[in-house]
């Protein structure tokens, strides 16, 4: 009896009859062969598959006997019996669309089979693209702007401003010094200025600024002014704006500069004005801020004639359109890794150099342009690491071997939508997700609710896609870790959790690692948001201090004294420290007080009582402004008074000011300030 193996892996069992044998002498031996089952590799695999299916069936039979809720949870947790993660099907539904979808493979790569030639074509194409890009940004970013008079006289340099910068005003409160001596000239002076695009929203103030007894926030910082059409002096095209108004925001409000492509204008300093009534602005900018009392400085806009302007118009709209157009063929024809990296790098430099630059540059100062490039490269290296992680964790699965039509229709447009965040999502009435900001900004709660509902809907859609692909369990664990980390960071004492654009994109994009249509849509927006956030604000911290959140707003300095008024001496003010406040600050530098009248510092000293009559005697310019305002009014004017603790020798070293108390001059009617600081 024995077992023999043949070359075909068939096993034969031989049974030998002991009574019939064959020996060496030639006798015959009778044997019986029994053919057994063939255990080839293929058959073994099929047997295992059948066993696996039987095990799966037994699991589902057990699941059927469980409670419905338990069955639902286990099915959600374990995923479908047969996971699937298919690319979008719509490109295959119609013949003409299928031809377009197959063109990169069937035609482009067939006609140009050499990978080296395709790569050389790509390099030449990108060089041509960059040359046009440079020709668009050069006249605005690098070439200095001038006004060239027709009479052949010397050309006049044009000053570049940002949307929220001052012209000849230093800042809020007492930044201009006593009687505004550090600012100016406040009259008889003209400037040629250049403003960028998007100043209809870029000229908003996001930190509260006191204007009289009002706190201005979440609106354009233009006080008074408005468009003027005068037959007496047709060169004057606006009413006077208070001189601490943002000039570029005011120019858009007056309609002399476009919010779409910026421009140049002439600013004429007009000196003191008796009041600044609110006016409705152009380009849907709303009403300006009203101020019903005098101020030492103002300016108006004048028409520019008798010459040619150069370098005035902001090309950002053309730059974005160019880069969107030139990036499309690469994304469509070439492998996804080329389209991804080329378009993300180009999108980043589009933001830095044109769409949303992090620094104000002045072409008359080449160092500022070099600084912009330096900042751009500084942020680019860590950004490339983030983009690599995003590619490996999510984008590669979606785009690699994906549908070219889906990439062009779904991923690419939403990518540029995210890049253009400053003209898309930033226009929503949401500044930051803090309790104070949500209360102060009109429409913020409604907008946040809408955004949250949209994100939740997208999350459910994408969670279902992950579940269908059988990876819900894995990503659920990942996002539980993310949420736990955010909760831990938000619990740190003295710090506030801040989810910036790039953080939001980086957290959400791994959950879009599927091949369906939803992944194309969501990934594009999220990658664009990452680029937008880093290009404009760098890798801002995920946790910030209370002082950083104030953004220069009052609330972090020494508390002001309590402002008093004595009816018996109705032209005098006094103040005293709160009993719980220290007499001097910890360093010992703040030893006196600073008094503002109509938002301009008029007194610095150690006295705790000040007479308005004495201030008028010591400051003839103040007395003249008050008298002129009285003559132009109905016999009374409002004086807005605020006081703070300050250093006598260096008044800019100060604490917070009180809110404004209102003294009606000259009859002495007093309205005490509201609680709080300014």
Swiss-Prot record:
Keywords: Membrane, Transmembrane, Transmembrane helix, Vacuole
Top-level taxon: Eukaryota
Membrane topology field: Multi-pass membrane protein
Chain ranges passing through the membrane: 119-139, 245-265, 317-337, 340-360, 371-391, 405-425, 443-463, 475-495, 519-539
Region (Disordered): 1-26
Keyword Transmembrane helix: yes
Chief localization: membrane
Compartments where found: Vacuole membrane
Signal peptide: none
CC annotations in GO: fungal-type vacuole; vacuolar membrane
Protein name: Uncharacterized protein YIL067C
């Amino acid at each position: 009896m024995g077992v023999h193996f043949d070359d075909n892996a068939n096993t034969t069992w031989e049974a030998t009859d002991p009574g019939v044998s064959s020996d060496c002498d030639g006798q015959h031996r009778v044997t019986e062969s029994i053919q057994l089952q063939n255990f080839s590799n293929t058959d073994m695999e099929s047997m295992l598959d059948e066993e696996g299916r039987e095990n799966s069936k037994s699991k589902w039979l057990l699941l059927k006997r469980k409670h419905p809720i338990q069955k639902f949870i286990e099915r959600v947790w374990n995923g479908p019996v047969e996971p699937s993660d298919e690319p979008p099907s719509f490109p295959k539904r119609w013949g003409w669309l299928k031809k377009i979808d197959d063109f990169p493979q069937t035609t482009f790569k067939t006609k140009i089979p050499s990978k080296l030639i395709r790569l050389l074509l790509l390099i030449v194409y990108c060089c041509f693209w960059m040359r046009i890009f440079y020709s668009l940004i050069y006249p605005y970013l690098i070439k200095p702007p001038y006004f060239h008079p027709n009479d052949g006289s010397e050309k006049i340099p044009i000053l570049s401003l940002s949307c929220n910068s001052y012209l000849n005003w230093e800042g809020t409160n007492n930044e201009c010094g006593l009687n505004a001596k550090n600012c100016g000239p406040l009259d008889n002076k003209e400037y040629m200025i250049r403003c960028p695009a998007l100043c209809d929203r870029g000229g908003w103030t996001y930190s509260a600024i006191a204007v009289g007894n009002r706190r201005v926030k979440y609106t354009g910082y233009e006080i008074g002014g408005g468009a003027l059409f005068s037959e007496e002096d047709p060169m004057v095209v606006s009413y006077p704006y208070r001189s601490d108004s943002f000039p570029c925001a005011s120019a858009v409000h007056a309609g002399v500069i476009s919010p779409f492509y910026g421009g140049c204008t002439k600013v004429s300093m007009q000196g003191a004005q008796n009041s600044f009534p609110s006016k409705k602005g152009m380009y849907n900018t709303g009403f300006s801020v009203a101020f019903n009392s005098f101020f030492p400085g103002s300016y108006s806009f004048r028409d520019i004639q008798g010459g040619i302007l150069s370098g005035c118009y902001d090309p950002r709209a053309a730059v974005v359109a160019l880069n969107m157009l030139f990036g499309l063929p690469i994304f469509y024809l070439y492998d996804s890794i080329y389209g991804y990296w080329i378009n993300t790098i180009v999108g980043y430099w589009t933001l830095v150099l044109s769409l949303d630059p992090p620094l104000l540059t002045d072409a008359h100062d080449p160092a500022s342009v070099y600084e912009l490039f330096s900042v751009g490269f500084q942020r680019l290296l860590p950004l490339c690491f983030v983009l690599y992680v995003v590619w490996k964790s999510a984008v590669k699965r979606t785009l690699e071997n994906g549908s070219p039509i889906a990439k062009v229709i779904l991923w690419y447009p939403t990518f540029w939508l995210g890049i253009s965040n400053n003209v898309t999502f930033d226009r929503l009435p949401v500044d930051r997700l803090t309790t104070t900001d949500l209360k102060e900004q009109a429409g913020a709660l409604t907008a946040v609710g809408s955004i949250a509902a949209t994100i939740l809907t997208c999350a459910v859609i994408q969670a279902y896609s992950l579940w269908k692909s059988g990876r819900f369990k894995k990503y659920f664990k990942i996002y539980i870790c993310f949420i736990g980390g955010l909760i831990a960071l938000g619990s740190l004492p003295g710090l506030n959790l801040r989810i910036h654009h790039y953080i939001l994109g980086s957290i959400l994009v791994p959950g879009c690692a599927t091949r369906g249509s939803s992944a194309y849509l969501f990934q594009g927006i999220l990658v664009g948001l990452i680029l937008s956030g880093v290009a404009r604000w760098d890798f801002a911290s995920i946790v910030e201090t209370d002082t950083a959140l104030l953004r220069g707003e009052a609330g972090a300095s020494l508390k002001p004294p309590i402002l008093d008024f004595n009816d018996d001496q109705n032209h005098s003010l006094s103040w005293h420290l709160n009993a719980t406040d220290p007499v001097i600050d910890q360093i010992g530098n703040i030893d006196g007080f600073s008094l503002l009248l109509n938002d301009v510092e008029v007194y610095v000293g150690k006295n705790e009582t000040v007479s308005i009559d004495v201030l008028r005697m010591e400051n003839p310019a103040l007395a003249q402004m008050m008298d002129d305002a009285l003559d132009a009014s109905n016999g009374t004017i409002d004086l807005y008074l605020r006081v703070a603790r300050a250093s006598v020798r260096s008044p800019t070293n100060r604490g917070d000011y009180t809110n404004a108390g209102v003294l009606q001059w000259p009859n002495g009617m007093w309205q005490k300030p509201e609680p709080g600081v300014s």
